[in-house]
Amino acid sequence: MKQDKVLQVCYEDQTVGTLAMTADHKVAFQYSDEWLETGFSINPFSLPLQKQVFVPVKDHFEGLFGVFEDSLPDHWGRLLLDRLLRAHKQNPDELTVLDRLAIVGTSGMGALTYHPEKNFPEEQSSADLDKLAEECQKILNTEYSDKLDELYLLGGTSGGARPKIMTTIDNEEWIIKFPAHVDGKDAGKMEYDYSCCAKACGIMMSETRLFPSEKCKGYFGTKRFDRRNCLKGKKKVHMLTTAAILELDFEQPSLDYHGLMKLTKIMTRNCDEDVENMFRRMCFNVFAHNRDDHSKNFTYLYEADEDKWHLSPAYDLTYSNTYYGEHTTSVDGNGRNPGRKELLAVGTGAGMKKTRCEEIIDEIEKKVKEMLEEYLLGK
């Protein structure tokens, strides 16, 4: 496979700018003149709308700025691509990050696209969900799967660690997850129950469903918030994870909810609704024992009509631990056993009224106990 050294980054029908590999294997970026006149900053922190060549300072993302790394698949998608390349007698270790972005092309998460695009599979078949789940397990257990091309097309550019596919249901774009080998077989039912509880707790969520299965209690699915139907057809929405905004290694604990609340205020220009929703997510994660609350699990969406950023719907909410036994994002400095005191400190520190914080804490603690008791008892 011929290596790419330069890529064009596009948004809808406009060229945002150019990515180019430097001699020291970092990927420089420069906005196009057209975008400087009519566009917006694709990362207000790292890439202000200025005429200059930007070069990453940090090395978390293989020489990329975080906003472009957000377009790349995480563990599952990367595993699929690497297996697919090997099946086609190609060495995945020879790919640069620009090659991987070119393979993502127009199919990545968010609104940014990369050109020239490298194409792989041409069409997807219609295997049922149980069959796809079986093929995912074969790959995770290092067995060969004869559905590599189909699985890559369905889910190879999605983020996250768990196997998943991206598909269209009733003209809407959805993500459907399958259990990983470390999950229980009913992980989908658990994540669905968590999503229902989160909605009851006033947390903004995309539509979720539990898709039927003959082999487990169902597969969890969620409507994509980076895709929307409009009068002109499908619209892609530009998105930024917190990891990308702050150029953080999401696999390392490096964030506190104080910082997340402050970031939400800055990104949304003090939108009270978004700030309160972030507070609700923190409370939910504490009471529902979601400790995998890393910096890629908090995202902001650019609303072009408003020329403004907003907090995205919540996602990846489920019972989870970390290998070090603490929240990935600490709560007022406490990652192991945060409680009411720390939650109040974060809320009031962000300018919320203490009485309002107490109301939300009580509301969410009660709802979580009512709706998620079966998952929390004895754990």
For the regions a language model picked out, list residue spans one by one.
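Phosphate/dinucleotide-binding and metal-coordinating scaffold of catalytic cores
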Residues: M1-S295, T299-K379
